[in-house]
From Swiss-Prot:
This protein's UniProt keywords: Hydrolase
Annotated gene: glsA
InterPro entries in the cross-refs: Beta-lactam/transpept-like (IPR012338), Glutaminase (IPR015868)
Any one of the GO BP annotations: glutamine catabolic process
SUPFAM superfamilies assigned to the protein according to its UniProt record, in alphabetical order: beta-lactamase/transpeptidase-like (SSF56601)
Presence of keyword Transferase: no
Cysteine pairs bridged by disulfides in the record: none
Family named by the database record: Belongs to the glutaminase family.
MF annotations from Gene Ontology: glutaminase activity
UniProt source species: Rhodopseudomonas palustris (strain BisB18)
Binding site for substrate: 64, 114, 160, 167, 191, 243, 261
EC class name: hydrolase
Known catalytic reactions: L-glutamine + H2O = L-glutamate + NH4(+)
The protein, known as: Glutaminase
EC numbers for this chain: 3.5.1.2
Length: 309
């Protein structure tokens, strides 16, 4: 076993012994059914070595982690023109807040809060039918992982559509300012479905490898984005990837990351590793509580914080 294998196993054992697991996302009925005892951790280093602990192959709803990949696709489609429709600043507000949109003329603060991700989804949808846009997103996820089995959890998507009134309000408000080009129902349908993609920690860590290695998958040699674009996506992940808990994550973990209310976290150690953690219990900001604890321990023990050891 490598040092990384040992560290990952130790962390998985430590997390299993803890009782402070946070609370699952009750406002999405399907997510409220998830057992809060689950935990997985997978790290894939630059050589392609996989260190796995806990429920590494248990699929979960990636939720807002999908926003990293839709951001990548939207930037590929219209480039830096995207930043005319969505900002790059932390919000300091809950992920589904409508308050800032009123003051900022319908322009969302960043692509990782719900309003921003809906605007990004609208870019991907333009020129397509909703089914085609979803197909593009799924093909991208399957390309990144080399796994054709990745799919949308239709029960979760339907659950979100039935209860996503706040997201509908955000979308309609942006539409009133001309930020969205497509019918609101179409954009929301694609948004709810890509948030309902189900992946395991192993699959998610595979998907994030291009961000850890200057836009390129080192195992396949495939270039996904330019080095500069990978760096900028990582920068937005660091400053905005955990809603109004982004500063706390940067302080404790010191890595770019993106959380989802399904309990997953994708973290990037630039030049070193792509990391996925999952624990469905959330903290007050809607981020995985023990996922953050595990990543803090990993970053500290491996000396991976971008701010130094």
């Amino acid at each position: 076993m490598t040092e990384l294998d040992v560290v990952v196993q130790e962390i998985a054992e430590e997390i299993a012994a803890r009782s402070d697991r946070g609370s699952v996302a009750h406002y999405i009925p399907e997510l409220a059914k998830v057992d809060p005892a689950g935990f997985g951790l997978v790290v894939i280093d630059a050589d392609g070595h996989v260190a796995a602990g806990g429920d590494a192959d248990t699929a979960f709803s990636i939720q807002s982690i999908s926003k990293v990949f839709t951001l990548t696709l939207a930037l590929g489609k219209i480039g830096d023109r995207l930043w005319q429709r969505v900002g790059r600043e932390p919000s300091g507000s809950p992920f589904n807040s409508i308050v800032q949109l009123e003051f900022e003329r319908g322009i969302p603060r960043n692509p990782f809060i719900n309003a921003g991700a809906i605007a990004v989804t609208d870019v991907i949808l333009s020129g397509h039918q909703p089914r085609e846009a979803l197909g593009e997103i799924l093909r991208f996820m399957r390309f990144l992982t080399g796994d054709p089995t990745i799919a949308i959890d239709q029960a979760v998507a339907a659950s979100e559509q039935r209860t996503g009134f706040r997201n509908a309000a955000l979308a309609n408000y942006m539409k009133s300012f001309g930020v969205l080009d497509n019918p609101v129902d179409y954009t929301l349908g694609v948004y709810f479905h890509h948030c309902a993609i189900a992946m395991s920690c192993r699959q998610l860590a595979l998907a994030g490898r291009y961000l850890a290695h200057s836009g390129r998958n080192p195992s396949t040699g495939h270039s996904v984005v330019s080095p500069g674009r990978a760096r900028r996506i990582n920068a937005v992940m660091l400053t905005c990837g955990h809603y109004d808990g982004s500063g706390e994550f940067a302080y404790r973990v010191g890595l770019p990351g993106k959380s989802g209310v399904g309990g997953g976290v994708l973290a990037i150690a630039p030049g070193k590793a792509s990391i996925a953690a999952w624990s469905p219990g959330l903290d007050a900001s809607g981020n995985s509580h023990l996922g953050r604890v595990a990543l803090e321990a990993l970053s500290k023990r491996m000396g991976w914080s971008i701010f130094g050891v």
